[in-house]
From Swiss-Prot:
Its main location: membrane. It comes from Mus musculus. GO terms for cellular component: basolateral plasma membrane; cytosol; extracellular exosome; immunological synapse; membrane; plasma membrane; tetraspanin-enriched microdomain. The record marks 116, 144, 148 as: Important for interaction with integrin. Induction: Up-regulated in response to notexin-induced acute myoinjury. The gene is Cd81. Binds cholesterol in a cavity lined by the transmembrane spans. The lineage of its organism: Eukaryota, Metazoa, Chordata, Craniata, Vertebrata. This is CD81 antigen.
Length: 236
């Protein structure tokens, strides 16, 4: 015997929430793939300075997002199917998966908040090392290529006024061309541009995580209510 009355409304409401959850998983997967192949981050994080690669902390987070998006799509489908079939087993499995996902999201959120400045800090240190080598050593072609990629990708020059002045006088070719020698001095500080690059992307990820967390809370409540309704309807 199928559920009736308010429980039936909850059944279809849960289906709608799961469909939205499935779509959210697809959006997160798409955003993660976009961040993974974004020309700005890709051109910077694929660089190597000698035998030292660029920091990969950002990409570790992206790979986690890709996995989360794929799992969300699977769990959303499981919830939709369980709600339509009125299966306590599927709904129980769905609830368990949601609890695990929610716990992982909270843990990832805490880790992200604690390390939110570390990604940009690592990239800035990598840039500073390359800039120092490029300015001090005329034969450091690898370092020059790294610095030039940063400057052209972010449209910046130097990490502070002194470094920018030194770079302008000694290595003007490292900065984006602008027609005169003062142009690099007027361009934005590279540290600031690196902060803007990663803070904007982390802000986008944070908004997506909050929206998904709210949906998950509603889904856990609705799935338990529907499970109880299915159990009660089978008694009568």
């Amino acid at each position: 015997m199928g559920v009736e009355g308010c429980t039936k409304c909850i059944k279809y409401l849960l289906f709608v929430f799961n469909f939205v959850f499935w779509l959210a998983g697809g959006v997160i997967l798409g955003v993660a793939l976009w961040l993974r192949h974004d020309p700005q981050t890709t051109s910077l994080l694929y660089l190597e300075l000698g035998n030292k690669p660029a920091p990969n902390t950002f990409y570790v987070g992206i790979y986690i997002l890709i996995a989360v998006g794929a799992v969300m799509m699977f769990v959303g489908f499981l919830g939709c199917y369980g709600a339509i079939q009125e299966s306590q087993c599927l709904l129980g499995t769905f609830f368990t998966c949601l609890v695990i996902l929610f716990a992982c999201e909270v843990a990832a959120g805490i880790w992200g908040f604690v390390n939110k400045d570390q990604i940009a800090k690592d990239v800035k240190q990598f840039y500073d090392q390359a800039l120092q080598q490029a300015v001090m050593d005329d034969d450091a072609n690898n370092a020059k290529a790294v610095v030039k990629t940063f400057h052209e990708t972010l449209n910046c020059c130097g990490s502070n006024a002194l470094t920018t002045l030194t770079t302008t006088i000694l290595r003007n070719s490292l900065c984006p061309s602008g027609g005169n020698i003062l142009t690099p001095l007027l361009q934005q500080d590279c540290h600031q541009k690196i902060d803007e690059l990663f803070s904007g992307k982390l802000y986008l990820i944070g908004i997506a995580a909050i929206v998904v967390a709210v949906i998950m809370i509603f889904e856990m409540i609705l799935s338990m209510v529907l499970c109880c309704g299915i159990r009660n309807s089978s008694v009568y």
